[in-house]
Structures are given as structure tokens and as C-alpha cells.
Design a protein with these regions (language model features):
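Terminal targeting signals and extreme-terminal segments of soluble enzymes
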Residues: 2-267
Length: 267
């Protein structure tokens, strides 16, 4: 069951949530490889990192030939973004070869860089491929949704975060390992989660990759914090994403295995 199905009748429909996410990730061209990304107010004061990564990827993709799709990216968060101002994305065209293109994006807010992103694009062509084996985890229908898990601990969450935690979302998560938002117990830095959009996405591989980029930051911080016994809402870190060759549409549930190695000098 999705979060919106558990909420009141005044909450947006699942399709409205997904359409809203699509609009949020869309950037507006300003000329000279510059783009504007809109904000979504009503959160906890800062812009969600996955939103900035996804918008930066959309900007980079708009500066590449349409037959080339992103297959990997690296993003570095420099400063926290605020909800009050739009973000400007400046794209640098580093390389265009016979099959590959490389783009860099600097995301700026109020004249200061908040994120750097490097993305590689590949023309679809035959070649060797491999992937990791599917982990041995329960099926999504055998797991509770994240909204249900949040309701069970809502009384332990600081008042200022409760509305943000319980509002309906466009992406539904079903974590394999129980989420402990306020628990400081140390655990290995490995999590598994099933996720999907709560309604169909339009058939657009560029949008599908942007949604994957958006989702990639949703559980990363919590996974990195596990070995240190830290709770959520802390830290800076690097994100990396490899995009596979599959359409998402209404993502049949995808399994995200998220191991984290050495995170650097500090969280």
C-alpha cells in the first residue's frame, strides 16, 4: 500500500504525485548551456540532494545529442541548498567522441556553487555487459511500506520533522532491513530496499534516469551512518550512480543494494 493510500482524502492522488516529481526534475533552458531548476518548498529548510543531482543530470542531458544517454555520474555536494531560491545549472561540454560524451555541471544558488556533477553519456550500441547477481531478499509484497514503518515511530521523531516524514511521496520504498531513524545502534554499512513510483512515469529514458538519480540519495546518508551509530539529518558526501539500460515507467519494483565503503574523513 502506498503512502498516499494511507493518507487523508485531501492528499494528492498517486498520479498527481508522480506528475509533480516529473515537473520538479524538469529544468528550463536559459541559453548558453544554462538551465534553471525550480524549488519545492514545504520541506525541512534545505533542498533535497537527490533533487539537485537529478536536475543537474537533466541539464547535462539537454546539452548532449539525443541518441546518447547517461550511463554514469559522480556528484559532489559543496553546500546545502535553500528552498527559497531557484538553482542555476551551468553545463561544460568537456568531450564528444564517436560513442561517448562527457559533461560537467556546476549547480549554483545565490551566486555560490552548491554541487558539482560529472556525467558520461554513451551512444546505444552492441557490446559486452554483466551485472551483479540478484541478492537473496524477500519479495516487496512480503515487506511493509516505509509509510507504515514511519507511523510506528512517529512519536519518537522531533516535532519539526513529522510533517515532512509523513507527507505522501511519489516514490514508495519497502526496506528489507528495518529502518531505525532515531536508533544509534552500530550496524554494517549495507542496506537493501525495493522501490517504485506510485503511478506510471511517461515513456522517456531521460526522465527515467533522472528519477533514478533522485532516488539514489534517499537512503545513502542513512546507510553511511550505520557503522558510526549516527542518526539521520547529518553529513556531506559523494554520490555515484551507474544507470542501467532498462525503462522504468511505473517501475516494477526495483531492488537497490546499497553497500558503502570508506566514506572519507568524516560524515
Amino acid at each position: 500500500m502506498t503512502e498516499s493510500e494511507n493518507a487523508g482524502s485531501s492528499d494528492p492522488t498517486p498520479q498527481a504525485l508522480v506528475d509533480g516529481l516529473t515537473r520538479l526534475l524538469t529544468v528550463s533552458p536559459q541559453g548558453n548551456d544554462r538551465f534553471i531548476g525550480k524549488r519545492q518548498p514545504g520541506g525541512v529548510g534545505r533542498v533535497f540532494g537527490g533533487e539537485v543531482i537529478a536536475q543537474a543530470l537533466m541539464a547535462a542531458t539537454a546539452a548532449v545529442e539525443p541518441d546518447r544517454l547517461a550511463h554514469s555520474l559522480h556528484a559532489y555536494f559543496l553546500r546545502g541548498g535553500c528552498e527559497e531560491s531557484d538553482i542555476t545549472y551551468r553545463v561544460e561540454r568537456d568531450f564528444d567522441g564517436g560513442s561517448f560524451s562527457a559533461r560537467r555541471v556546476i549547480a549554483e544558488q545565490d551566486g555560490r556553487p552548491i554541487l558539482n556533477l560529472a556525467a558520461s553519456f554513451h551512444k546505444l550500441e552492441p557490446g559486452v555487459a554483466h551485472q551483479d547477481a540478484m541478492p537473496d531478499v524477500p519479495a516487496p509484497e512480503d515487506l511493509p511500506g516505509e509509510a507504515e514503518l514511519r507511523r510506528a515511530v512517529i512519536d519518537q521523531i522531533p516535532e519539526r520533522f513529522r510533517r515532512q516524514m509523513m507527507r505522501p511521496r511519489a516514490v514508495e520504498f519497502r526496506p528489507v532491513e528495518a529502518r531505525h531513524w532515531m536508533n544509534r545502534e552500530k550496524r554494517p554499512p549495507l542496506t537493501h530496499s525495493w522501490f517504485r513510483t506510485v503511478a506510471p512515469l511517461r515513456s522517456d529514458p531521460v526522465l527515467h534516469r533522472a528519477v533514478l538519480a533522485f532516488v539514489s540519495d534517499m537512503t545513502l546518508l542513512g546507510t553511511c551512518a550505520l557503522p558510526h551509530g549516527l542518526s539521520w539529518m547529518t553529513g556531506e558526501m559523494q554520490s555515484a550512480l551507474a544507470a542501467r539500460r532498462f525503462p522504468l515507467r511505473r517501475m516494477d519494483a526495483l531492488c537497490d543494494r546499497q553497500p558503502v565503503g570508506w566514506p572519507g574523513s568524516r560524515l
